[in-house]
Every structure is written in structure tokens, then in C-alpha cells.
Amino acid sequence: YGPHLALENLNLKIRKGATGLLGPNGAGKSTFLKTILGLIQATSGHGTVLGHDIRTEGAAIRSRIGYMPEYDALNPDMEAIHQVKYSGELLGMNPVVAMSRAHEVLQYVGLGEQRYRNIGSFSTGMKQATKLACSIIHDPELIIADEPSNGLDATAREFMISTLQNMVNNGNRSVMMASHLMDDVERVCENMVLLHKGKLAAQGKIDDLKDIDREIEIHVWGNASKLEEKMMSIGLIVRREGRIMRVLHENDDTTSKILACAKEVDSQIRRMHEYEASLEDLFIVIMENLGYEVKTSEDLLRSPVQGRQVDAPGYMGGGS
């Protein structure tokens, strides 16, 4: 975009299955999705999606991909059945076949009884379900879902995530899901790609990436600050939230070092266990390594990035 490089030296391979696309606001996620859909042309480089060239075969790519955009792409004056049917016709489906499929997919996404209502009367959850129906009418091999659970209440969100899970586990489809809701990504996706300033910051299996920095969680009673200072003085890496501390599990001696420090400062450890990191934890650790001070993913995913100007490393952890 003019002098600004939205994507730079981005080299990655995404395999079949479910992949979460993550990154701060302005990281290049939308540009990446539009590029692989063939909607915009990359100024350099090359790529393929399902074996099709992103530069010359955009129409072929879009015929095999279902795209559920974040923005409102529905006609409020159309009945859901005709909106979904129209999506099929845009993809070249016979009108009779498109109508038959529209009934099927609207039933699948839970709108079978509401299919003749105008979309303008739908709730946010029903509109999201309609967009999902539009994206799968042609039975695509890959579904790109951009913020699929955004703005949904708990019930609608659960239904959306369960439906995407079912598509991956039982429908033999691949899903690429961009979302700021880490719990949703972790439930649906096995793999993740994290973009930062248009570059690849991390890629791999979520479980493998979470295992890079294992931690021991301790619940402390008495002299918590002294214990924190003592552990840090001998080189242990500590994250603290009140009386709960997480210590980087560097080797087999870490536990004994923690206990020795607690004894020295007369602090009681009421509980100690291996901490099971979440995708949220992983995201924060990676972004902190890139120079940002964050408390939650919301700080970066839904608001402008502020922090030191640090270039993303070429690659971090995991498999492709």
C-alpha cells in the first residue's frame, strides 16, 4: 500500500487441518487473507493455495474456498434462503442446485426454521450463521473464517465454535480461523500462524509452541515479595500475580531451587504444580519477546499497537 509493506518476506506452508491466524491490529492478517484469495496482487513473490497460483488463478481458488468475512456482507432486505442461494449462483452453481443446497446448509447452521425471514430482522448470531452458510454452500475444501464468533452471546458462540470443530473433525475440511478470542482458536485449531508487522513471528502446532517455555506454578503464603526477589537473585525467571508465581522450568533442579529459596526467606508454598499454558499465555510471551508490554491479548488484537519498534524474528518454534 504505497510505501508501506503490508507483508514482507513471508514464507510459510500451511497444512491440512485447522489453523489459527493471529496477530496484533495492523499485523497484515487481512492483507494475507485477501492475497491468498486472489483478491489483491502481491507486488513480489509467489504462492499457491490448493495447488492454484495466487497470482493467476484467483477464480479457481475462490471456487474451492469458503470465505466468511468479518464485515457485514449480507443484504438486510433479502430472505436468508435467497441470500445463500445467491452466493451459490455467484460461484457458478445451477439455480436449482443452489436452492437445494441453501436449504441444506441453513439447516446445518441452525437456521432451518428461520430461512424465509429477512436478514435485517436477524440477531448478530443469526447473521454470523448466515455468513457461514454462504461460505459452505459449494462444499469447499477450505473455509476461511474471519472473526466468526465476534459479537456473539455465549449460546451462539458455543454453537459457532462447535460447528467449526465438527467441520474439521467430521467434515474432512480445513479451516483457517482469524480471531481475537484465544479460547475459540485453541478449541478449533491444532496449528497457528502469528504475524507481526507483516512478517512471520511464530508458526507451528499450538501444543508444541506452548511447550517451549514450561513453567512451575506455586501458591505462596507469607513473604511473597522476599521469595520473588530471592528466586530472581539466583537466576530463576519469575512471573507473579499476587500470591501466585510462575517460574520457568529450566531443568530438573528448578523445583529444589524454589523450595530452598522458600525455606531461606521463611515462606510457605501451599501448592506447586506444572503450569499448563494456554494459547493466551503463548501469545503474550511471544509479543513480550517482540518488545511489547501486555496483560491480555485484547491489548494488542483489538487496539492499535504501541511499544518498542522491534522487528519480528524470521521464525519461532514448532513445525510448519
Where are these regions (language model features)?
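A short linear hydrophobic-aromatic micro-motif
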Residues: 110, 235-239, 268-273
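Alpha-helical elements of the RecA-like P-loop NTPase motor core of helicases
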Residues: 76, 183, 229, 256, ...
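ABC transporter nucleotide-binding domains
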Residues: 1-196, 202
